[in-house]
Amino acid sequence: MSPQTETKASVGFKAGVKDYKLTYYTPEYETKDTDILAAFRVTPQPGVPPEEAGAAVA
């Protein structure tokens, strides 16, 4: 039988939903020659902000 280990939930990852435009959206980002462009057409469900629907694809 393998020994039991204690897991701490607060180490390395904190669960929860963050507002996409507050954490990942960077409108002033300037593209580089090494960037790859991918395009998706996303239609958010009623009541879902476009940024949040786009974050689901990202």
Swiss-Prot record:
Keyword Chloroplast: yes
A GO molecular-function descriptor: monooxygenase activity
Record's keyword annotation contains Chloroplast: yes
Principal location class: plastid
Pfam families, A to Z: RuBisCO_large_N
InterPro entries: RuBisCO, RuBisCO_lsu_fd_N, RuBisCO_lsu_N_sf
EC number(s) given by UniProt: 4.1.1.39
Annotated keywords: Acetylation, Calvin cycle, Carbon dioxide fixation, Chloroplast, Lyase, Methylation, Monooxygenase, Oxidoreductase, Photorespiration, Photosynthesis, Plastid
Gene Ontology cellular component list: chloroplast
Reaction catalysed by this enzyme: 2 (2R)-3-phosphoglycerate + 2 H(+) = D-ribulose 1,5-bisphosphate + CO2 + H2O; D-ribulose 1,5-bisphosphate + O2 = 2-phosphoglycolate + (2R)-3-phosphoglycerate + 2 H(+)
Enzyme class: lyase
PTM sites of type N6,N6,N6-trimethyllysine: K14
Remarks, miscellaneous: The basic functional RuBisCO is composed of a large chain homodimer in a 'head-to-tail' conformation. In form I RuBisCO this homodimer is arranged in a barrel-like tetramer with the small subunits forming a tetrameric 'cap' on each end of the 'barrel'.
Functional note: RuBisCO catalyzes two reactions: the carboxylation of D-ribulose 1,5-bisphosphate, the primary event in carbon dioxide fixation, as well as the oxidative fragmentation of the pentose substrate in the photorespiration process. Both reactions occur simultaneously and in competition at the same active site.
Recorded family membership: Belongs to the RuBisCO large chain family. Type I subfamily.
Protein name, as recorded: Ribulose bisphosphate carboxylase large chain
Source organism (scientific name): Euphorbia characias
